[in-house]
Structure formats: C-alpha cells, structure tokens
C-alpha cells in the first residue's frame, strides 16, 4: 500500500490522503472530490472505502460527489453528520478489514466529540485528522470540544510504536513551531525543524514518525518533559501543562 498526499493550498491548509495498491483505493476525509476521482481513474483503481475522522465540513465536503461517481464505496465514520449517514459506524478498538489491507479505529475526542483516527499497522500509518498535527494538536473551539479529552487522546497516540507515521489533516508546521519557540526559544529540536521546514512548500514537508514527533511537538512533550518546567514552573507536567499550553496557543 502507498500513501498519496495532496496539499490544497486553501485557507485551512488541508492535506488530502489516498491509500492505494495496484487495484484498490481508500480515501480519507475528502474535501475536494475531483482530485481523488482523477487519480483513481488515471490508475484504474476501485474505490473501496471513504474514511471520515470527524464531521467538520473540510473533512466531508467531497463525500457526496465521490459517492455519486463511486456508489459502491462504503463510508466509515463514528457518527452521522449533516451531509450523509455512514454505511458503517466505527468505535474505539474496531478492526476494519478491507481485504487488501486493514486498520484499527482509535476514538480520539477533544477537538470534537466524534473524532476517530485510523491506524494502518502494517503500513505504519496513522491518519489522525485534527487530533494531532506536526508540532501541535487540534483546536478546542467546537461546541463539543474538550481540552481534557484532547489530552487523553494525545496521550493515547503518543503511546503507539515510535515508527508509526502520523498523517495530519493540515499543514501547520510553521505556526506550531513558532509557538513552541515562544515557550522554549533555545530548544534544539524546535529550532532544527523550524529551519528545516521554513523554505519547503507544504507538499514537500516531511512525514515524520512518532519518535521524531515526540521531540518536536511541545504538546506531547508536556506530558513528561521537565524542560517545560523551566518556562512554566507554576504548572505540573501532564494534563495541567497541556491545558495551559493549549490556552496559550489559542491566543498566539
């Protein structure tokens, strides 16, 4: 299985993902149906499934059009939304077998209450939607958002094998690292990656594994990294530090 990534260059800086082999394809969180349709047709693939991490519009807007073109594709999601009902409802710990590959469902609320991630263990790929970003985490602005649930979800993801690569739904590399450097301006990892991505177009930015992400993500580091106590000594590591950082990032 291969992962195809597109950057949409829209105001939300969305990434779009498609998994495929020589015969089949799986779409993740389609915003723009046309790019998927073009690739599927060019490579003579069969669209087997559409996986939805959560119900925000920039993750589901392309579903209806894809289903018009590929009516046999099955939609997997945690809950209903305003545009469609999924064919298959998923829950935490579910194992989904597509025949040519499979994934495990991880319930990861916090950004919104219906959020799930899809872990393809064989491919070492985690499609994490808006829960985890490179160097950051999802916002907590939705009505059903909960920063404590987001913390628990990030802890869950951070406990996965370090060689698994997270594929987030947005490119927020620079802004997240700028925020991290506002807290720890001399941090080696933050400075290294900020320099690495500064001149790269979004479509060329790296896909790092969780072992690397744990070094460059201040929110993952807030779980246990004592260096944060130097910058924010009045907060305890773990949930308290994470919540404080999320509040600071809201106003950054």
UniProtKB/Swiss-Prot annotation:
Residues annotated as binding Zn(2+) 1: 54, 56, 111, 130
Zinc listed as a keyword: yes
Positions with a binding annotation for Zn(2+) 2: 58-59, 130, 170
InterPro entries for this protein: Clx_II_MBL, Glyoxalase_II_hydrolase, HAGH_C, Hydroxyacylglutathione_Hdrlase, Metallo-B-lactamas, RibonucZ/Hydroxyglut_hydro
Required cofactor(s): Zn(2+)
Known EC number: 3.1.2.6
SUPFAM superfamilies assigned: Metallo-hydrolase/oxidoreductase
Cofactor note: Binds 2 Zn(2+) ions per subunit.
Keywords annotated in UniProt: Hydrolase, Metal-binding, Zinc
Pathway where this protein functions: Secondary metabolite metabolism; methylglyoxal degradation; (R)-lactate from methylglyoxal: step 2/2
Gene Ontology MF terms in the entry: hydroxyacylglutathione hydrolase activity; metal ion binding
Gene Ontology BP term (one): methylglyoxal catabolic process to D-lactate via S-lactoyl-glutathione
Function: Thiolesterase that catalyzes the hydrolysis of S-D-lactoyl-glutathione to form glutathione and D-lactic acid.
PANTHER family xrefs: HYDROXYACYLGLUTATHIONE HYDROLASE (PTHR43705), HYDROXYACYLGLUTATHIONE HYDROLASE GLOB (PTHR43705:SF1)
Similarity comment text for this entry: Belongs to the metallo-beta-lactamase superfamily. Glyoxalase II family.
Name of protein: Hydroxyacylglutathione hydrolase
Lineage summary: Bacteria, Pseudomonadati, Pseudomonadota, Gammaproteobacteria, Thiotrichales
